[in-house]
Design a protein with these regions (language model features):
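Short, intrinsically disordered, mixed-charge
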Residues: 20, 31, 35, 90-93
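Arg/Lys-rich, positively charged N-terminal/basic patches that mediate binding to nucleic acids
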Residues: 1-29
């Protein structure tokens, strides 16, 4: 069964800002999420349907927010920790 990977417009905009080397790290993180969606941490409160996977790109911690079910993975947002959750809440309203 093939798993469908979808991107939100916010994620696509944030991915465009990365260089090729950073995109390779991102692709590894996305592949991990496809194989095992529980690799991230499920958020609580207002963001209880969101999972966040944390990974490093050249000594900088990045967060990748996503939702998942058996058939798909929806990549919602990508960024550094600064204002990440505030911007995520604003986007999801």
């Amino acid at each position: 069964m093939a798993i469908q990977v979808l991107q939100t417009p916010l994620f696509a905009r944030q991915k465009k800002k990365l260089n090729k080397k950073q995109i390779k790290f991102l692709d590894k993180a996305v592949n991990l999420i496809i194989e095992n969606p529980k690799v991230g941490e499920q958020k609580k409160g207002n963001l209880n349907s969101i999972w966040v996977y944390k990974f490093k790109i050249t000594d900088q911690l990045y967060l990748l927010a996503y939702e998942w079910d058996k058939k798909s993975r929806v990549l919602i947002a990508l960024g550094v920790h600064e204002n990440f959750y505030r911007n995520l809440k604003k986007y999801l309203k």
